[in-house]
Amino acid sequence: MKRIIHICLWLLTGIFAEVSLSAQNPFIYHKGKTYKDVAAYRMEEIIDLNTHTPSTPILYEQQVPEHQSTLSYKVALPLYVRGIFFSRDSRPGDYQWPNNTNRLLPWMFNRLEDLTRSDYAGIPSNALPSASGDALLLELADGEYLFAKAIAGSNSLSWFQVNQDGTLTLYVSTLGEDALTGRLPLLIFRKSSSIYHVFSDAYDSLIADKAISALRKRADKEYFNAFNYLGWCTWEHYHYDIDETKILNDIDAIEASGIPVRYVLIDDGHIANKNRQLTSLVPDKKRFPNGWSRIMKRKQADKIRWMGLWYSLSGYWMGISAENDFPLEIRQVLHSYNGSLLPGTSTEKIETWYEYYVRTMKEYGFDFLKIDNQSFTLPLYMGGTQVIRQAKDCNLALEHQTHRMQMGLMNCMAQNVLNIDHTLYSSVTRASIDYKKYDENMAKSHLFQSYTNTLILGQTVWPDHDMFHSCDTVCGSLMARSKAISGGPVYLSDSPGEFIADNIRPLIDETGKIFRPAAPAVPTPESILTNPLQSGKAYRVFAPTGDEALSVICYNLNTSPAYREVESFVKQEDYLLRESTGKSADSSSDNILAFNWEKQSAEVLNASERKIKLSGFTDSLFHLCPIRKGWAVIGIQEKYLSPATVQILKRTTEKLILDVHCTGTLRIWTDSHGKQELRSIPIKKAGKIEIKK
């Protein structure tokens, strides 16, 4: 029987199974093309994930066969109970991996071969799983967890393939004409007894190895100030049908609404293009005859203070047109490949293009950029030379230039390895497929994907849960609460005349500042390895809020009428989940108070679970607040994230001093000499308050 060995410890030999490099390159990308079972040089040795050495979590190939652009390895997996495969969905005739767009989806399985079945019960608003993916989470038979992720080298990219028989293959390739060389990174994997630490440990290792990433932890990044405030985006209201007059009229309507929207994000529809290729950085002259000047004049410090603009990383959806108006020195840093102009081929030329690109937007007066279509930049280069290096340089140049010019950056359609692993400065990335008004199944899928993907993305960025409609009669208020607990940007896309203030004001203070959690919401342990659209069970997420609270939302995301009503719960032990986010969960509390936000009621949790009935597509928000020295601080009851509305300055057995961040009704729980009381204190002005028992 073939011996299974650790990949880094042995000389590697292989079986030739690839057409020569001089033949037509198999990686030239086009819509509908898949890379399943792509021709590769098959390595004899097996990557054995049973052998875990914490000190060497990144596996490297030390002996790369000559003249090979693509290698493949069999992957030996430990005994497992169930898992998640992270890949996009696969639609015949549609774009495929590595163009993951916003479609890195969590596919649940008991056995890997489940994912290959035509009757796989997946996500109703999406197609079947792609066999090609970027990450894998396993719950092991011994109770531990294993997380494995594909990685990029200087000019290589790895990916996983789930095979029909349930086996797993790892590929690594240049995705082009050149051969693999040097010390070749293959994958990263970590094991842990904690389902949360297995992700954070893997990212600690990834960040530490500068050969395979350009990353910092989310907590170490600066969060762009505009994203602390409520915004509005044109996309879901208009899609491509925007122009200067409409935007100016909407700014008038926003200001008249009384809702303190502080930034406007102008989405797609303004770009000068030919056949979906960029022709100019000047906006479409028919739609914007005055350029951006009239719109920029509407910025005011106490109203709409910031303006953001949508663009594509590659120019426009299909790259850059040869028929462009760029200065000669900029044209010289572009090269023609496969029907498009692209930045390159050198790192210096790519930096020059993005310096021009970002500087132009800065000079127009924009404060931040939403850069979309990022995962399609790699396919535009595929089949050529230095594919990975050039595509990666595009992401890095964007990071360098927006940081240097102090421009905010929202990353969108940025869910392949090159995008995810090179957010050096930017702190926001879209976590899911678009939200659509009135589409219940899509909303459920959106929530499931957003929260689960945050286990990965949330290590290095805040998750952008996409814009939403406050007027959505299916889930407007539910979506507002999910945006609040996400911690990411919150931006509306209603027609301003349709704003529903009751769904918006609980998100913000009087200036439009969002009450945010201390870390982004992720699923509770029992919810991570289940598909809540099919499970017949409730789905729960949590985030640390304020100085010491934990907020929990319980959902019914089931799509089957058989599970229209499900039961959920909160319990004392949930509070300890704060520790998994890197925040303190001091066990010195006397007890845990559960505040039901919808019912505005509170109860002390005992040893048993507090049961909750969820009927239909609904949610239930709780704040778990520790009782210390006879006090539990809930916060302003009118705001979704009540604990985030106050800062605890001092607490004794007789006195509590708080800094309250907004007006409203302050809820405080007290226990004095056996008398328990849930107090309501009107706050007419934000600031310091002293409360005595």
Over which residues does each language-model region extend?
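Solvent-exposed beta-hairpin/edge-strand motifs
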Residues: 79-92, 574-599, 669-681
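Carbohydrate-binding surface patches
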Residues: 483-486, 491, 530-590, 621-629, ...
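Alpha-helix-loop-beta-strand connector modules within alpha/beta enzyme cores
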Residues: 292-299, 389-409
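Aromatic-lined carbohydrate-binding/catalytic grooves of carbohydrate-active enzymes
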Residues: 225-388
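Glycan-recognition surfaces
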Residues: 317-362, 396-503, 522-530
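Carbohydrate-recognition beta-sandwich/jelly-roll modules
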Residues: 25-263, 285-288, 306
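Bacterial Sec-dependent N-terminal signal peptides
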Residues: 1-25
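C-terminal beta-strand-rich structural cap/linker in extracellular carbohydrate-active enzymes
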Residues: 605-646, 666-667, 675-693
